[in-house]
Amino acid sequence: MRPPRVSALLLDLDGTLVDSEPLHRAGFEAWFAARGWSYDDDVAGLFTGRRADDVFRTVDGPWRDGDPQVMLEEIVRLVPRDWLVEPLPGAAETIESARRAGIPLALVTSADTTWAAKALAPLGGLEVFDTSVTRDDVDIGKPDPACYALACERLGADAGAAVACEDAPNGVRAAVGAGVGTVLGVTTSFVAERLREAGATRTIPDLLTLPALLTG
């Protein structure tokens, strides 16, 4: 069922619009392995959808004595400079549908602006969004709701009538915390149960069904 009078569509990037989570995971796995630390699914879940330096700073782990910013930079350097990512199913159609319907569109991501711009190149770049909120725009990342609150503020949109799409529990919590009325959990990275436990209104396998939900 289409959410009535959608005030804005708020889209996460990694794992929602583009298939970049394997690229992120490879960098983390290499960095952890070099230190003899395990990077299993439970550890990966701490980082997915969050800024790595926030995790290093606030979550206890074998990294506790390191500098969060330095550790983040070390991981980033392990990602190949010539990386490319592919749009996930339904990403292009969702953006096109929202723009055609006149629904204000925002990117809300834990990535920095440089990463976001490159990752979005196959979809038309940051320019396809009415606004974008990246890690460069907020002091604290997801699951803190500041990023979603800022996106709604910039768009002049009622959060309660907005729709957000997120692939990770941390992102779902951020959107719910900002009062976003409809939070769709996209099961590209986590099972539906995990996303519902985080507060997702409903779950979908990918964005292919979203244009129909938005336009009725």
Predicted regions and their residues:
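N-terminal helical cap/lid subdomain that shapes the substrate entry/recognition surface
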Residues: R2-E96, R100-A101
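Conserved phosphate-coupling serine/threonine residues in phosphotransfer and NTP-handling enzymes
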Residues: T16, T109-A111
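Residue-level detector of alpha-helical recognition elements and their boundaries
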Residues: A30, D42-V43, V59, V70-M71, ...
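Proline-centered loop/turn at the N-terminus of a beta-strand
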Residues: P104-A106, T182
